[in-house]
């Protein structure tokens, strides 16, 4: 073992971490200037290994910290790494590190980076061969000089330390302390023995009276024992009887509680049924109200439809009569029109003939009148014009005017002809258009009738679907109410579960669900969602009989959360904390649970709890972790036996536990608050709620949605049909309007036709007159201008006058006749057009309208709708009647349930009264049992107070009755009163003091033996100390002589043990001969004392001659240092260490002696490591490795250097300063 490496940081001049290159296992030399830090390096090693730095005050610790430029060092450490390949240290490692760390307020040791105590370190070093009694494996600078100048007594002290006499001294001090303590105890015992002897003498005198007293007292105690024993047996019998009664009462109470719980369960079940039935009644009543409202609405619709149908039927019936009447009227109108037309046909030819004659007469009259006018004009022109030429000029002018007027007349006549022709053509065209529109009107009417029929069909279908939807709505409402009732029931069960569970746990479960919902909404951490499996309680099932024991076993572990891995739980917890959610959660990560298969006992009295649980094998680890080491046992006795035998937790079905550690827990467990039962109820309610919601969503809501879609489609169809109806009705109205307009046009054209014809006739007559005047003027042109008419012209005038008179008379007759006929025609035509034909048009229109109504579309649709509404009313009434029946039946059922509830309430009350009665009885029995137990304790106490009794006392009075016993007891008490003055405890005190005397005598003997042993031990210790000093002196003296001869060839040295005699004079013994002298002196005294030694002297000769032997004070300084070195080497050879540290031991030696010391170190380095410092080259010759210490900026540094650099360093230390 040797120092392999040293690491220093912050210690004295070593500020930065300094890792010294590994040392050689032989001789290592450190060189450096004065003050560079060599000695500090040695101090660092001594700081870790030596006792010198063991108890440091804060200011001393601060003094060891580095002080220099830069920030202050607040802590320092020194670490020594030992090569332990030889296993000298009792640690199974080739390298062992020992570090000491100090600061202003700390001082710690670390062994292989583990904190240890100072004592542990010192013990470890002592086990490796580092002796506390020989600290000279580290020789500091100046130590050689100190030893060279030390007095003899100091060397004796050194020899005693090397010999290890300190241990003997410590043990001697302990022995002296024990001896003093023993002496004190001996004195106390002597005093007690003296007092006891005096007391025993006094008690001896009181014994005689006490004997009589004891005789009667013995009898009294025997009697009292018998009395108390009889009372005790009687009390025990009563207690046994009470225990049996209590057990019976307890069993009965359990049965009553079970019956009461059954009654409560039945009552809860009945209450639930009543709630469900009331909810059902409420739903049915609500449905009935809805049905009533629907029925009222349906009745209103039916009434409207019935009135409408009646109106339509009446209208159809009326239309039929009206049609007959209209047809009859039409026929009469046609007959009258035909009659009038016939009359008109008969009158019109006459009228036309008269008119034609009249027109001819008028034309002839006009012509004759014009001709006469022309003749008169001709006669008048004779006086009018003066000449023929003037006349002709005027005639030409008149002719020109007449020609222009005639042309105008002709144009007018042509225009009227054209107008009449156009009127006739328009009439034909109008008739064609009218017929075409009439055909279109019939088509439109047919299309409207078809659309009406289709509209009513769609409407009826829509009404049927609405009725079906109303029914489904009622069903949905009923289901919703049932759903609400289920939700309320679920909330109550969840509330009960919450009440039976801690708030923090429930908050934790809610918070975990929020975290998972957050992951689902965000669509993240899918593996976390898949890796979470809920709480333990939701993942297994078992029989209800095991609920209590399972729940008691698991406790709050029922609410632990099962996850696939610790990663899943970490993710959940990170989000849990991030969202700052409340609650307490505990995870069971399946990948981290370490469960082993358990060997269960094979017995019929117990079964493994886990075998009664049903769960997914995937979660086997979690359930084995919670329930795997628990047995369900038949009874507490079995539980206790198995728990002790198999180191397993055991539990009964009632929940009484026996831990494998020995603890027993149990008592009454309220099964009504079973969390497993509550969880089962919650789960069942959730499933039922889910089924109702699924039914509601899958059936009713889907059907309602389907019907809504169909109704929407039908509404769209109805809107489309209505749009088409409006379109075709608008087209029909347009056609009718257009037909009316055409008819009016035709009538208007007929009205203007006759006036135009008369105007044409008038124009033609006027044209003839103008043409006649023109012919007359033309004939007069060129004739002679006469003042009188010619005879022929005069005759013509007379003839014309006669003709004119005749024509005027005829014309008047014709005019009268024409006016008469025209009046007839006008009256007939007016009657025809304004009355008959107009009425005929009205009749035709009414007949057309009747034909539209007579199609029966509206009536058919109304009748169909009325039948549908009647069916719905009937269905509604039937459903309402069914609801009434159901309500009656349900109310009857509620009454029956209420009666049953009353019965169960009475039964529960009876059970409760019985339980209360049993409880009171039990309390009475408990009180009585308490009193009996108290009496029992009193009897037992009194029996104990009687003290020890002879054997006869247990049997002597057993046959006596209590009366006899009390009589004898009274007699005893009377006799005992005579000895009331006697010291009752005299005998006891005598016996007690006698026993104490014996014990004290034994204790005195033991102390005497102990005192003698201590004296012997002290003599042995003194002898061993003497022998150790003698042996050590011999070894050191021998080694000193040998080492000195090697250091000083031819020289001689010896150690001298100096003694002091009784008279104060001194003697001395040298080296080897001292042993016999001491043994001789030992024969005169039983134990030789080391106190006779006063010092260790040194006698040396550097020439080897006996006569030149000198004392230390006679030597020079170098010789003293050499002798001191020889003494140190001698001590080290006597008690070798694994390594040595020498700081400038060759300082005062000359070159020759330094060489001898170097050779000595080389010899010793074969078996031990040396680390030395020097300023001389001789020590370098025996070294294996060299180190240089430099000091820069108040900081020391140590590095490996070569031998040449080391020599250069010691020869001229300024080179590497």
Swiss-Prot record:
Binding-site residues for ATP, renumbered to this chain: 32-39
Residue numbers spanned by region Disordered: 242-268, 1059-1090
Keywords assigned: Acetylation, ATP-binding, Cell cycle, Cell division, Centromere, Chromosome, Coiled coil, Disease variant, DNA damage, DNA repair, Intellectual disability, Meiosis, Mitosis, Nucleotide-binding, Nucleus, Phosphoprotein, Ubl conjugation
Coiled coil: 179-350, 393-503, 669-916, 958-989
GO molecular function: ATP binding; ATP hydrolysis activity; beta-tubulin binding; chromatin binding; cis-regulatory region sequence-specific DNA binding; double-stranded DNA binding; dynein complex binding; mediator complex binding
This protein's domain notes: The flexible SMC hinge domain, which separates the large intramolecular coiled coil regions, allows the heterotypic interaction with the corresponding domain of SMC1A or SMC1B, forming a V-shaped heterodimer. The two heads of the heterodimer are then connected by different ends of the cleavable RAD21 protein, forming a ring structure.
Subunit-structure text: Forms a heterodimer with SMC1A or SMC1B in cohesin complexes. Cohesin complexes are composed of the SMC1 (SMC1A or SMC1B) and SMC3 heterodimer attached via their SMC hinge domain, RAD21 which link them, and one STAG protein (STAG1, STAG2 or STAG3), which interacts with RAD21. Also found in meiosis-specific cohesin complexes. Found in a complex with SMC1A, CDCA5 and RAD21, PDS5A/SCC-112 and PDS5B/APRIN. Interacts with NUMA1, and forms a ternary complex with KIF3B and KIFAP3, suggesting a function in tethering the chromosomes to the spindle pole and in chromosome movement.
Stated role: Central component of cohesin, a complex required for chromosome cohesion during the cell cycle. The cohesin complex may form a large proteinaceous ring within which sister chromatids can be trapped. At anaphase, the complex is cleaved and dissociates from chromatin, allowing sister chromatids to segregate. Cohesion is coupled to DNA replication and is involved in DNA repair. The cohesin complex also plays an important role in spindle pole assembly during mitosis and in chromosomes movement.
Name of the protein: Structural maintenance of chromosomes protein 3
Native source species: Homo sapiens
Gene, per the UniProt record: SMC3
